[in-house]
């Protein structure tokens, strides 16, 4: 009896491989491994790279396109601990595919905001379920309002980026704006600068450099680079002036009026208050130029595709309306009166 009891105790002891032999009864010698417990399964499901990333190759084209679209969006695919590395797109696609096949209704509920109308065909097998029908109808409504929603989101993100750049000060400095739009700068500001202001612009003061007392304040490399930038800017200015003159030559009827206005502008010298108004108008036009996406050297994808710019202060809404008045109430009322 003692030997049999010892044998039973031995049968209950798990080995190092994680395989726990089943409890045996009298005369039973089976040592079939038992399956993992529910906690182990839950832990495995939370692991981002459980599904093989190559399994997405077996998906239908419609399902694969849907999974990749959601993986590329800003929607979180799964919860992660702080400090964990971000999931790659193949890992996201694998996790999404696993959830779609195991729990399609949960998938639809969780990621419906990232779905488009063409993705609804992937949930045809859920038709008839009142919850699935409700979520699919919501996706269809989003598709109808999506262009306007995307346009509003785009302008809000650019406006938030504009405020950030204005606070930074560098992007909308005189030097940067002059380099981006030399002709516009010359028309509003450059032609009215005094000789002292021109000299200050040519040799802008720099912060003292550390080193020996004999170190020059303006190294040769900086002077050469500044000279190169100035030549490039002058070439750009000349090109824009030639393009503008070509446009004026096409309007032959107004040539005389243009010449008169040019003479008047040459004779007119604005005072300090008028120069301030010109500067404000120039800066406002540069702001609008940025919002319209006309700054060729700026990577707008860093703003348009960045959800971090979605949080706008409610206090700034009034100021935002100055830039984005898509419909003027006076225009609408006048159109209605004209129709009567």
UniProtKB/Swiss-Prot annotation:
Keywords, ordered alphabetically: Acetylation, Coiled coil, Nucleus, Phosphoprotein
Name listed for the protein in its UniProt record: Coiled-coil domain-containing protein 97
Gene name of the encoded protein: Ccdc97
Signal sequence extent: none
Modified residues annotated as Phosphothreonine in this record: 47, 215
Compartments, as annotated in UniProt: Nucleus
Annotated positions of the Phosphoserine modification: 272, 334
Coiled coil: 229-258
Reported function: May play a role pre-mRNA splicing through the association with the splicing factor SF3B complex which is involved in branch-site recognition.
């Amino acid at each position: 009896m003692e030997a049999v009891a010892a044998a039973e105790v031995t049968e209950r002891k798990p080995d190092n491989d994680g395989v726990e032999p089943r409890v045996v009864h009298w005369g039973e010698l089976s040592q079939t491994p038992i399956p993992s417990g529910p906690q182990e399964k839950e832990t495995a499901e939370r692991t981002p790279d459980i599904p093989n990333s190559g399994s997405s190759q077996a998906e239908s084209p419609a399902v694969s396109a849907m999974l990749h679209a959601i993986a590329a969006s800003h929607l979180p695919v799964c919860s992660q601990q702080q400090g964990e590395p971000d999931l790659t797109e193949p890992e996201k696609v694998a996790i999404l595919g696993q959830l779609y096949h195991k729990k399609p209704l949960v998938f639809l509920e969780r990621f419906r905001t990232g779905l488009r109308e063409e993705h609804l065909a992937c949930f045809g097998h859920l038709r008839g379920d009142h919850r699935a029908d409700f979520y699919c109808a919501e996706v269809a409504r989003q598709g109808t309002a999506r262009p306007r929603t995307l346009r509003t989101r785009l302008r809000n993100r650019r406006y938030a980026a504009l405020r950030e750049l204005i606070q930074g000060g560098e992007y909308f400095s005189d030097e940067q704006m002059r380099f981006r739009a030399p002709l516009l700068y010359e028309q509003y500001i450059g032609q009215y600068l005094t000789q002292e202001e021109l000299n200050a612009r040519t040799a802008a003061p720099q912060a003292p450099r550390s080193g020996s007392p004999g170190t020059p304040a303006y190294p040769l490399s900086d002077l050469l680079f500044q000279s190169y930038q100035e030549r490039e800017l002058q070439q750009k200015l000349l090109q824009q002036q030639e393009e503008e003159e070509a446009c004026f030559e096409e309007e032959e009827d107004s040539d005389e009026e243009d010449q008169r206005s040019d003479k008047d502008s040459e004779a007119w010298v604005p005072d300090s208050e008028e120069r301030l108004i010109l500067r404000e108008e120039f800066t406002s036009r540069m702001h609008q130029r940025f919002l319209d996406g006309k700054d060729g050297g700026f990577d707008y994808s860093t703003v348009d595709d960045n959800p971090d710019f979605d949080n706008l202060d409610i206090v700034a809404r009034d100021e935002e309306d100055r830039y984005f008045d898509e419909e003027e109430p006076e225009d609408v009322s006048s159109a209605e009166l004209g129709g009567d």
